[in-house]
């Protein structure tokens, strides 16, 4: 049996296809979903969603910018603030953005809490895009 997986952002459907397995970036760690999984509602962190399709045993990567996932009767519905398929991300641009975000994060003054939070969020977004594009494992 397979899962029906939908990834929906405010402006587009990022993914809508059958899959054998899904790995979600939940706020408490990675969460694997197979057919027959118990019903579930979970918050998602900024990170990489991995989907193994029935047609190909390869994993597809999708960068997610946080959201929620619901699992119900072999249907996985993922509502995200933003999402981008790894195969549409330019690897070199993602590598540059990741490096720049890492540098900015390291340069934030220790006492500037708001700047630290913003730089950390930018770093997590850049890392997710770079990972989804195949730059980091």
UniProtKB/Swiss-Prot annotation:
Key words, A-Z: ATP synthesis, CF(1), Hydrogen ion transport, Ion transport, Membrane, Thylakoid, Transport
Keyword tRNA-binding (UniProt): no
One matching Pfam family: ATP-synt_DE_N
Cellular component GO terms held in the UniProt record: plasma membrane-derived thylakoid membrane; proton-transporting ATP synthase complex
Name of protein: ATP synthase epsilon chain
Domain of life, source organism: Bacteria
Family matches, as InterPro entries: ATP_synth_F1_dsu/esu, ATP_synth_F1_dsu/esu_N, ATP_synth_F1_esu_C, ATPsynth_dsu/esu_N
Compartment(s) where it occurs, according to its Swiss-Prot or TrEMBL record: Cellular thylakoid membrane
Annotated membrane topology: Peripheral membrane protein
Main localization of the protein described in the UniProt heading: membrane
Annotated GO MF terms: ATP binding; proton-transporting ATP synthase activity, rotational mechanism
Family under the similarity heading: Belongs to the ATPase epsilon chain family.
Keyword Thylakoid appears in the UniProt entry: yes
Quaternary structure (record): F-type ATPases have 2 components, CF(1) - the catalytic core - and CF(0) - the membrane proton channel. CF(1) has five subunits: alpha(3), beta(3), gamma(1), delta(1), epsilon(1). CF(0) has three main subunits: a, b and c.
Function: Produces ATP from ADP in the presence of a proton gradient across the membrane.
